[in-house]
Regions:
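Conserved phosphate/ATP/ADP-binding segment of small-molecule kinases
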Residues: 114-201
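Short pre-catalytic strand/loop immediately N-terminal to key active-site residues, enriched for Gly-Thr
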Residues: 12-13, 201-215
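Charged C-terminal helix
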Residues: 235-271
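Conserved N-terminal subdomain of the carbohydrate kinase-like
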Residues: 2-101, 105-113, 267-270
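Short, small-residue alpha-helix embedded
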Residues: 142, 211-240
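Glycine-rich beta-alpha junction loops
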Residues: 11, 38-40, 79, 105-107, ...
Length: 271
């Protein structure tokens, strides 16, 4: 069992963020130590939501670490560049621990409107030296300075996933991360994940589910981290994470993407 310090937000509705991290990592046998970066009434895909920022993050971390040592650190949604800078300070003092970063900051080719250029720069510092990171295609482009629109011009080609893999073959050198999984690359009828580890570029693919549910990235990264901490290779952990997300999405009854994927009823797959 590993003690995992989790920096992420929590949402009342959305089945995402810490709402995904906690049950999945616990199911995989790890002790979760959440540091809430922000509390949302509903995830941001809903029209109306209320949010409260954690203005005492550094003090929260100090209180926790005075009583329990963290074996691993997970970084997710960090609200703004100032809060991410605080998290980076914790990371810089914890590089002897296993560091996992899900650099949540954009999708569909755009930086989320609540973030600015400084957030991207701070995230580049957060991923530097991380043991594993799990950006989506947009976030990978932001981290590596790749032109998303030019890359997406190849989307209709049957070799699109391989084109993306070639584009990011030097991603680890560029970002300073030790390994990476570029997640959720849509390729027609299937979804691909690009696994970058030890100089190799490998791929994991699954059938694409027609509804793009909220929180699938959080579910994926939770399984990925949990399995890595159990000693799985990056590739094997990616296989398990991708299969779990696919099965959970296929068995989700609610078709409103905002409520997220119904992963809890599939937790037995992690036994």
């Amino acid at each position: 069992m590993k003690n995992v310090l989790l920096f992420n937000d929590i949402s009342g509705l959305g089945n995402c963020s810490l709402g995904a991290n906690l049950p999945i990592l616990a199911k995989l046998g790890h002790n979760c130590i959440p540091v809430v970066t922000g509390a949302f009434s509903c995830q941001t895909g809903f029209v109306h939501f209320t949010v409260s920022r954690n203005d005492n993050l550094t003090k929260c971390v100090a209180d926790i670490l005075a009583n329990r040592t963290a074996d691993a650190l997970y970084v997710g949604f960090c609200m703004d560049s100032a809060l991410l800078a605080e998290v980076c300070s914790v990371l810089n003092a914890s590089r002897d621990r296993f560091v996992f970063v899900d650099p949540i900051m954009g999708d569909n080719g755009s930086l989320y409107s609540i973030f600015d250029a400084q957030y991207v720069e701070n995230m580049k510092q957060a991923v530097k030296g991380a043991d594993c990171i799990s950006p989506n295609l947009t976030e990978a482009c932001l981290l590596a300075g790749v032109d998303y629109r030019e890359l997406l011009s190849h989307k209709g080609e049957p070799t699109f996933l391989a084109i993306c893999g070639k584009t990011f073959e030097n991603f680890l050198t560029t970002t300073g991360a030790k390994s990476a999984v570029i997640t959720g690359v849509e390729c027609g009828s299937y979804v691909g994940n690009i696994v970058l580890d030890g100089g190799a570029v490998r791929y994991v693919t699954n059938e694409r589910v027609p509804v793009n549910y909220s929180g699938t990235g959080d579910v994926f990264s939770s399984v990925l981290l949990g399995e890595l901490l159990l000693g799985k290779s990056t590739y094997d952990a990616t296989l398990l994470a991708a299969n779990f997300v696919c099965k959970a999405a296929q068995n989700t009854e609610c078709q409103d993407r905002r409520f997220g994927v119904e992963f809890c009823k599939m937790l037995n797959l992690l036994d």
